């Protein structure tokens, strides 16, 4: 399979950033995208709502179903799955995009924020994927894709920001577990993570401001890699913790200069993403 035309994606989040970029790449093929997101109205510090994202998806050539809801709420998840199936006739892909980030050290991390990261990142990934599995089983080439890193249990990352590390690794463990559990059903489940930081609001506001943004790549590189993953044969392309650049290289892309957030920035000057040595 080399196209997402007519395929239906149910994603968590997607109002902006990486999730929206992936949605727009799929929309260019004529995919259907349902987004479960909280952003019913504009955020004072963040661009985009689930409704503005839907408008962009339609303009790019896809069909959109904006669903206002919270991935922490089981009823909202059930409703999103039912609405997506009702609107588009099925679900081919689940994209676990919604994620909360807080890089605070353990003594500075509030219990509330720790729980939030666990609830959105780990539990949300599990519950949304699980709710969609009965429908994915009927899809021609079903995929689950989570935007989380490979498991790297080194002190460097476990100790840097334990709460966030556990939440992101939890997403990966859920996804790899689903890959094993539903392999016989032909459902692929993989994770995807970049080698460099991506120019998103999270990087701007929480990681490094303008300096790191200028040393990042655009979300288009993530979107192009996700597209490759989601068009692979599900029965054989599964159970992997994939790296964005490796996926593209395996697909014949060797020049990443066009993805630099600031044109002309050499690869050597880009800021490495966390969790990778």
Regions found by a protein language model. Give the residues of each.
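Short-chain dehydrogenase/reductase
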Residues: 2-88, 101-102
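Active-site loop of short-chain dehydrogenase/reductase
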Residues: 7, 62-63, 90-91, 136-150, ...
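Conserved Rossmann-fold SDR core element
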Residues: 26, 90-92, 172-175, 182-194, ...
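Hydrophobic positions on the long internal alpha-helix
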Residues: 80, 95, 128-132, 136, ...
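Amphipathic alpha-helical dimer-interface segment in Rossmann-like NAD(P)H-dependent oxidoreductases
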Residues: 86, 103, 111, 120-140, ...
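Catalytic Tyr-X3-Lys loop
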Residues: 100, 107-126, 145, 164, ...
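Catalytic loop of short-chain dehydrogenase/reductase
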Residues: 137, 143-184, 195-198
């Amino acid at each position: 399979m080399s196209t997402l035309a007519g395929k239906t994606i149910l994603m968590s989040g997607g109002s902006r950033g990486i999730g929206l970029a992936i949605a727009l790449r799929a929309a260019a093929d004529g995919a259907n995208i349902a987004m479960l997101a909280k952003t019913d109205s504009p955020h004072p510090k963040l661009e985009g709502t689930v409704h503005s994202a839907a408008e962009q998806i339609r303009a790019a050539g896809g069909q959109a179903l904006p669903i206002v809801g919270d991935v922490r709420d089981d009823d909202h998840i059930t409703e999103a799955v039912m609405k997506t199936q009702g609107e588009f006739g099925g679900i081919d892909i689940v994209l676990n995009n919604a994620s909360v980030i807080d890089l605070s050290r353990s003594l500075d991390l509030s219990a509330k924020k720790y729980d939030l990261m666990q609830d959105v990142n780990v539990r949300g990934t599990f519950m949304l994927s699980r709710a969609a599995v009965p429908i994915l089983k009927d899809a021609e080439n079903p995929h689950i894709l989570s935007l989380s890193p490979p498991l790297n249990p080194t002190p460097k990352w476990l100790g840097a920001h334990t709460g966030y590390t556990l939440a992101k690794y939890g997403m990966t463990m859920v996804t790899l577990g689903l890959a094993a559990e539903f392999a016989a059903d032909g459902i692929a489940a993989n994770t995807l993570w970049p080698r460099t930081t991506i120019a998103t609001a999270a990087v701007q506001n929480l990681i490094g401001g303008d300096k790191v943004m200028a040393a990042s790549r655009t979300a288009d590189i993530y979107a192009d890699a996700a597209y490759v993953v989601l068009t692979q044969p599900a029965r054989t392309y599964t159970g992997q913790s994939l790296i964005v650049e490796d996926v593209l290289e395996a697909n014949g892309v060797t020049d990443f200069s066009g993805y630099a957030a600031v044109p002309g920035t050499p690869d050597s000057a880009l800021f490495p993403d966390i969790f990778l040595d």
